Curated annotation (Swiss-Prot):
Gene: mraY
Protein name as it appears in the record: Phospho-N-acetylmuramoyl-pentapeptide-transferase
Organism encoding this protein: Bradyrhizobium sp. (strain ORS 278)
Chief place of localization: membrane
EC annotation from Swiss-Prot or TrEMBL: 2.7.8.13
PANTHER family per record: PHOSPHO-N-ACETYLMURAMOYL-PENTAPEPTIDE-TRANSFERASE, PHOSPHO-N-ACETYLMURAMOYL-PENTAPEPTIDE-TRANSFERASE HOMOLOG
Pathway: Cell wall biogenesis; peptidoglycan biosynthesis
Cofactor annotation: Mg(2+)
Pfam family, one: Glycos_transf_4
């Protein structure tokens, strides 16, 4: 919306005196900064009201796993969930205000984010109303997520309009691209669905998921800005995708809304993100990675999410095949709890890992 302010000076000559000041709204970097501040302020201001409303409507709050760490039954009992509504509200408001409303990439990523958020919201709703961990049926949920992701990937491929839009770039190599053709739509959907569920599995401790999400968002905000700039992408020899620079504004909105949410999610949490937030944010990261052609880099920067997801897959596969469990409990953050690590130790150490992985992922932009 603010992007159009500069157009007012062209439409109304009497406003041309403000052209110098309003010209800053042309710059993605300025609008990204504005999106960060707006997203954070929105959640800061409306967060307490949303939390009170959710606590009143949910009563007992999110059901706590009885087979998990016993400390959670006491410390987390009665805490409301669906905190992702705070993040999504701040994200949408900030993006609408600061992003170019004519950019199709922004709307595609927003559609995936809200679509996954709706699936997560329904899952949270079922869990809260039934006071059970069996929410939305797993297969049905995955089918809906896959449908959303397939439509989004098809739209992204159509926007690309060149052979490289259906290829997979390999980090550290200048011209190595695996060509999928139209099968890339399926691969891209797998990336989006996988990212959504990986972040969902990570969200198990206060503050554990939101900070790595913010780190990944900041990293992909930079990648989107560079990939959407012809000069920078040519210098770094990365795939140029015209128009994706605007996704940096959306990433800024996520960063700001995430900061606001962390204020209330810091231990002891006043609210949980829930599937509403974790699925939405994971789907967002996956769709941005597909849009800017850095799918493998997402697996590096979001390596913590991959670790959490793999720990669950390995645990389930091992138990079904051998009857034995590899970890004391999965996802892996609960394994460390069982080993005696405190919740703050796990959360902060995982944050540190996320920062290190982000630096490694960003280094792939130059090391080719």
């Amino acid at each position: 919306m603010f992007y159009w302010l500069i157009e007012l000076t062209n439409t109304f000559p009497s406003l041309s005196v403000f052209r110098g000041v309003l010209n800053v709204f042309r710059y993605i970097t300025f609008r990204t900064g504005g999106a960060v501040v707006t997203g954070a302020l929105f959640v800061f201001l409306f967060g307490p009201w949303i939390i009170d409303h959710l606590r009143l409507r949910q009563g007992k709050g999110q059901p706590i796993r009885t087979d998990g760490p016993q400390s959670h039954i006491i410390s987390k009992k009665g805490t409301p969930t669906m905190g992702g509504l705070m993040i999504l509200s701040g994200l949408v408001v900030s993006t609408v205000l600061w992003a170019n409303p004519l950019n199709p990439y922004v709307w595609i990523v927003l559609a995936v984010t809200l679509g996954f958020g709706f699936v997560g919201f329904y899952d949270d709703y079922l869990k809260v109303t039934k006071q059970s961990h069996s929410g939305f049926a797993g297969r049905a949920r995955l089918l809906i997520e896959a449908a959303i992701a397939l439509v989004a990937c098809y739209a992204l491929v159509r926007l690309g309009r060149d052979p490289s839009s259906t290829g997979l770039a390999i980090p550290f190599f200048k011209d190595l691209v695996i060509k999928f053709g139209w099968m890339y739509v399926i691969f891209g959907a797998f990336v989006i669905v996988g990212a959504g569920n990986a972040v969902n599995l990570t969200d198990g401790l206060d503050g554990l998921a939101i900070v790595p999400v913010m780190i990944a968002s900041a990293s992909f905000g930079l990648i989107a800005y560079l990939a959407g700039n012809a000069v920078f992408s040519d210098y770094l020899q990365i795939h140029y995708v015209a128009g994706t620079g605007e996704l940096a504004v959306l990433c800024g909105a996520v960063l700001g809304a995430g900061l606001g949410f962390l204020w209330f999610n810091a231990p002891p949490a006043s609210i949980f993100m829930g599937d509403t937030g974790s699925l939405a944010l994971g789907g967002m990261l996956g769709s941005i990675a597909v849009a800017v052609k850095h799918e493998i880099v997402l697996a590096v920067i979001g390596g913590l999410f991959v670790l959490e997801a793999v720990s669950v897959i390995v645990q389930v596969a091992s138990f079904k095949l051998t009857g034995k469990r590899i970890f004391r409990m999965a996802p892996i953050h609960h394994h460390f709890e069982q080993l005696g690590w405190t919740e703050p130790q796990i959360v902060i150490r995982f944050w540190i890992i996320s920062v290190m992985l982000a630096l490694v992922g960003l280094s792939t932009l130059k090391l080719r």
